[in-house]
């Protein structure tokens, strides 16, 4: 991230923002001049082709929000040799002592197990908590990653393609659950129909610029074609 210029919240409704910011990674500037405001309570979908800067923007937003944001990364970042339960539990490692975490690794805490079991059931993972993550399907692993983010119990959900490995019907249900459990959501997606159906603001990115920023109810899938047009 390079020369990130942030905007201090000016009103109670202001959550985060960038004012003529330069954002990038590995000495590569992705956004040379980004201005963006995000308000509390918004449901925002980031759309655009691969490589246009969605992940860069989410990383900058995560840095700005700190422990307000629950993070669900694109690559899941799960520990393959640990169980689904332990991967979900990792969402709240910082809430427990090192000793408690070590004991839980050997013998799951009863209260944590019950809470995570209830969460897993809502995500269709019941019966899979003891299974190693590397023995789960791609869609199941993605739901474990979502469960870990939900278990963090933070007001803002930040997701990088959190439903990319599930079918549209499952994706819709997962997005409903994510929206129900968080006051604010900012999610990168590639499924435009899901974005229009489950988010109230669409931000379209291309070549380091915001080229669409509009209420979802004012847009159709065809309006988003410009985001995916060949160079």
Report each predicted region and the residues it spans.
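H-loop/switch region of ABC-family ATPase nucleotide-binding domains
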Residues: 189-190
């Amino acid at each position: 991230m390079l020369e990130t210029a942030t905007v201090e919240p000016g009103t109670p409704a202001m959550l985060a923002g960038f004012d003529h910011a330069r954002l990038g990674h590995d000495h590569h500037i992705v956004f040379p001049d980004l201005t963006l405001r995000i308000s509390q309570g918004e449901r925002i979908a980031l759309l655009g082709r691969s490589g246009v800067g969605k992940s860069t923007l989410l990383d900058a937003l995560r840095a700005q929000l700190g422990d307000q944001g629950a993070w669900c990364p694109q690559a899941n970042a799960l520990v393959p040799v640990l169980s689904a339960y332990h991967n979900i539990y990792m969402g709240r490692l910082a809430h427990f002592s090192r000793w408690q975490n070590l004991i839980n690794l050997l013998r799951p805490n009863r209260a944590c197990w019950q809470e995570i079991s209830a969460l897993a059931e809502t995500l269709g993972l019941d019966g899979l908590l003891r299974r190693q993550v590397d023995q789960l399907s791609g869609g199941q692993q993605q739901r474990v990653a979502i469960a870990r983010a939900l278990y963090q119990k933070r007001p803002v959900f930040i997701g990088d393609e959190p439903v990319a490995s599930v079918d549209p019907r499952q994706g819709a249900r997962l997005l409903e659950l994510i929206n129900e459990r968080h006051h604010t959501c900012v999610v990168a997606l590639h499924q435009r129909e899901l974005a229009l159906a489950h988010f109230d603001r669409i931000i379209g990115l291309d070549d380091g610029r915001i080229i669409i920023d509009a209420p979802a109810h004012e847009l159709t899938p065809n309006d988003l074609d410009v985001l995916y047009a060949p160079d």
